From Swiss-Prot:
InterPro entries on file: Ribosomal_uS19, Ribosomal_uS19_CS, Ribosomal_uS19_euk/arc, Ribosomal_uS19_SF
The protein's name in its UniProt record: Small ribosomal subunit protein uS19
A Gene Ontology molecular function term of the record: rRNA binding
Keyword Ribosomal protein: yes
Keywords: Ribonucleoprotein, Ribosomal protein, RNA-binding, rRNA-binding
CC per GO annotation: cytosolic small ribosomal subunit
SUPFAM superfamilies: Ribosomal protein S19
One GO term of the biological process aspect: translation
Entry function: Protein S19 forms a complex with S13 that binds strongly to the 16S ribosomal RNA.
Family per similarity comment: Belongs to the universal ribosomal protein uS19 family.
One Pfam family, short name: Ribosomal_S19
Length: 141
């Protein structure tokens, strides 16, 4: 028997979260995200954040109508993922290129930058001749 669990964020379902105003949503988020949300949306200090939110709302409206969603690109790595963004793909800049980030309900409350890594794992090759002291005694090919 398979049990399907509904997604909840701090006791609220996704539909309840989508209906909440940003001020109410900020109250249930952790302190760091709450301060960031209120600073951006209550004081209106960042025009870039508000422009991105408008783009997201337009894309969500098109997606609900069944039309093709436009590509949303942003450099705002400090933008908090909101419930209305679920289902969209946002391309986040990692310093070199735009990395597509598929927004799922589990990502609500996180920053966009968390999902577009700025560094990649270093993969070293084989050491060459004279790379170490011990290779001085290796026979040449």
């Amino acid at each position: 028997m398979e049990s399907t669990s509904k997604f909840t964020y701090r006791g609220y379902t996704l539909e309840e979260l989508r209906q909440m105003p940003i001020e109410k949503l900020a109250e249930i988020m952790p302190a760091r995200q709450r301060r960031s949300l209120l600073r951006v949306f209550k004081q209106g200090t960042s025009e870039e954040h508000l422009k991105l939110l408008e783009k997201i709302r337009r894309a969500a409206k098109l997606a609900s109508e069944g039309k093709k969603q436009p590509v949303i690109k942003t450099h705002l790595r400090d933008f908090i993922i909101l419930p209305e963004m679920v289902g969209l793909t946002i391309h986040v800049h990692n310093g070199k290129e735009f990395v597509p980030v598929e927004i799922t309900p589990e990502k609500i409350g996180h920053y966009l930058g968390e999902f577009a890594l700025t560094t990649k794992k270093v993969e070293h090759g084989e050491p060459g001749l004279k790379a170490t002291r011990s290779s001085m005694f290796v026979a040449l090919k």
